[in-house]
């Protein structure tokens, strides 16, 4: 039986005989003495195999990388000058007495300490990739985060209750993953995008504090921080108001950081959605980046430069400047690179001005656009932006959404660049905040209708109920997002607990009474039985752990993730199924050839 882990062998065990089990990370033959670095989930220990024990030494000679081994030996101090300060076991080594090969290994397709592996190679050989110390560290930290979350919620009276995985398809924003029913021909289940409705029903049922750490599913285009299946820390509580809910779960995240990383998070500023969009063009601003927008829409309405004046005069248009302190030293090729970057977000281009001498007005500026701006506009740009000599101003002028997306992304990109970090535009710290007072609705131009910003079950601010009938665009929601370093870590809201208010929201969304009853009748019925005031939120566990580990991708903190094409390169899912299975499910493929190709 194993007596300890490799990575836990330390000076505390000097002189003791221990039994270890793990994998040969590296084997070295030094003049008749064989050294084996034995590895397990806790780390490495150096094993010394002397030729004095012939049978053991012969077995050691046959060991290769990734052989699974059992080793019995005595812990001793390493010779002076050979210590390794990077390891817990770095001051000791194990003198091998017995060595047993539990299972040999074929030659691995890569070295586990190769840091230049492609993600395709890593995901194809995920079993081996997960043996890498960095991956094991990530997943162990993930476990510790989940454990601390459970401890906190249990201590605060929350009950872990499971909700169904096979449920009803309801409009929640993204596409559902559908599961055909064999028993009920032509009918489909949906995999849950969130347990939203069930947790509200649990509040009506009297379980006033609920949580679960559960899988959710969304069939949407993937990005670096998205997966088709993801893990959510889902929470709901009755009888607490918005401020109390925020306070409790800010405390939870503080507890997790303190317990897992020994980090004390700073205070959480509370910022209204409108302010976040005005200053940063984003509802999840990265406060580590020390640049903000300068609003110029009114200033640009009367300039003789259509690139600025047209969006400034248009309904829903916006013109802003982004001051980059010290940016005057940027080369034209760097500026051109940023111009191409903003086009990804729909911008047509990127106007700029270099400030050589702010005191000289027009004469102290360098830019192809200066000639198109009158003196008053130039003076306003300099004054409002606070531009100084050596600064660079970038401009966004378009529909507000395009400006916010493009210049908001530019702000983050410059801040995170080598230029930004060396120029003091980025502060490496933990920067949390709450964003509150989101709009209740946003207008869908294509469908010419209102859509819920969060979900249709979010309560409006007190006194805003009537705006749903008269002016939905001005209706503010009791919604809140926790943002950390530019990532939405979690989001939630106070929910609607009165059936008549819920019906009003459905009406604003052009969901008629019959459709509402068909899709949400079970909720409307439940709300009539004394539903308590309630609210909650959900945190993305994958995102939280990605931030805490500073991983390059969310896929580095998930044991068996999907690619950006929603494929599993290890198991080759999704995969074709045979005709018999399709017949049982009453399914016929429109394009049978499409179902024949694997990953």
Swiss-Prot record:
UniProt key word Glycosyltransferase: no
Binding-site list for L-aspartate: 172, 218, 454, 495
Compartments (UniProt record): Cytoplasm
Catalytic activity: tRNA(Asx) + L-aspartate + ATP = L-aspartyl-tRNA(Asx) + AMP + diphosphate
GO CC, one annotated term: cytoplasm
Primary enzyme class: ligase
Superkingdom: Bacteria
Residues the record marks as site: Important for tRNA non-discrimination: 30, 81
Record GO biological process: aspartyl-tRNA aminoacylation
Molecular function per GO: aspartate-tRNA ligase activity; aspartate-tRNA(Asn) ligase activity; ATP binding; nucleic acid binding
Record function comment: Aspartyl-tRNA synthetase with relaxed tRNA specificity since it is able to aspartylate not only its cognate tRNA(Asp) but also tRNA(Asn). Reaction proceeds in two steps: L-aspartate is first activated by ATP to form Asp-AMP and then transferred to the acceptor end of tRNA(Asp/Asn).
Assembly with partners or alone: Homodimer.
NCBIfam families in the record: aspS_bact, PRK00476.1
Protein name: Aspartate--tRNA(Asp/Asn) ligase
Gene assigned in the entry: aspS
């Amino acid at each position: 039986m194993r007596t300890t882990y490799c990575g836990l062998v330390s000076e505390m065990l000097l002189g003791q005989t221990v039994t270890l089990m793990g994998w040969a990370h590296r084997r070295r033959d030094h003049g008749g003495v064989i050294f084996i670095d034995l590895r397990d989930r806790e780390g490495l220990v150096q094993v010394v195999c002397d030729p004095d024990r012939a049978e053991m030494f012969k077995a050691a000679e046959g060991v290769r990388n990734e052989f699974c081994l059992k080793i019995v030996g005595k812990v001793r101090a390493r010779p002076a000058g050979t210590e390794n300060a990077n390891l817990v076991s770095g001051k000791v080594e194990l003198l091998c007495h017995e060595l047993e090969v539990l299972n040999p290994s074929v030659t691995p397709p890569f070295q586990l300490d190769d840091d230049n592996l492609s993600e395709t190679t890593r995901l194809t050989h995920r079993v081996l990739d997960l043996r890498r110390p960095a991956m094991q560290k990530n997943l162990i930290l993930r476990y510790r985060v989940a454990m601390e979350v459970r401890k906190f919620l249990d201590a605060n009276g929350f009950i872990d209750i499971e909700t169904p995985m096979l449920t009803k398809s309801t409009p929640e924003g993204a596409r559902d993953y559908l599961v055909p029913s064999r028993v009920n021909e032509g009918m489909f289940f949906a995999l849950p995008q969130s347990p939203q409705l069930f947790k509200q029903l649990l509040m009506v049922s009297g379980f006033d504090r609920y949580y679960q750490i559960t899988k959710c599913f969304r069939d949407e285009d993937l990005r670096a921080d998205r997966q088709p299946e993801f893990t959510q820390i889902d929470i709901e509580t009755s009888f607490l108001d918005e401020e109390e809910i925020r306070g409790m779960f800010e405390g939870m995240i503080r507890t997790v950081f303190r317990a897992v990383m020994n980090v004390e998070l700073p205070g959480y500023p509370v910022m209204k959605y409108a302010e976040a969009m005005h200053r940063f063009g984003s509802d999840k601003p990265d406060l580590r980046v020390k640049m903000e927008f300068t609003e110029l829409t009114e200033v640009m309405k009367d300039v003789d430069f259509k690139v600025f004046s047209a969006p400034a005069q248009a309904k829903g248009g916006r013109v802003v400047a982004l001051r980059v302190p010290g940016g005057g030293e940027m080369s034209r090729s760097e500026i051109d690179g940023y111009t191409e970057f903003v086009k990804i977000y729909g911008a047509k281009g990127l106007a700029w001005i270099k400030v050589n001498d702010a005191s000289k007005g027009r004469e102290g500026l360098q830019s192809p656009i200066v000639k198109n701006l009158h003196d008053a506009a130039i003076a306003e740009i300099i004054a409002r932006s606070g531009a100084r000599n050596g600064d660079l101003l970038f401009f966004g002028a378009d529909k507000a959404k395009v400006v916010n997306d493009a210049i908001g992304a530019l702000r983050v990109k410059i801040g995170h660049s080598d230029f930004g970090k060396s120029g003091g535009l980025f502060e490496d710290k933990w920067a949390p905040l709450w964003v509150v007072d989101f709009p209740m609705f946003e207008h869908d131009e294509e469908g010419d209708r209102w859509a819920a910003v969060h979900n249709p079950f979010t309560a409006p601010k007190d006194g805003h109920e009537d705006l749903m009938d008269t002016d939905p665009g001005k209706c503010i929601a009791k919604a809140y997002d926790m943002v950390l370093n530019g990532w939405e870590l979690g989001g939630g809201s106070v929910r609607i607990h009165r059936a008549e208010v819920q019906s009003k929201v459905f009406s604003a969304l052009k969901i008629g009474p019959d459709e509402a009853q068909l899709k949400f009748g079970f909720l409307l019925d439940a709300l009539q039985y004394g539903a308590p005031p309630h609210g909650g939120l959900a945190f993305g566990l994958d995102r939280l752990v990605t931030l805490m580990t500073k991983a390059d991708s969310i896929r580095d903190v998930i044991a068996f993730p999907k690619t950006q094409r929603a494929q599993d390169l290890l198991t080759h899912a999704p995969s074709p199924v045979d005709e018999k299975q399709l017949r049982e499910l009453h399914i016929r493929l429109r394009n049978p050839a499409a179902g024949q190709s694997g990953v």
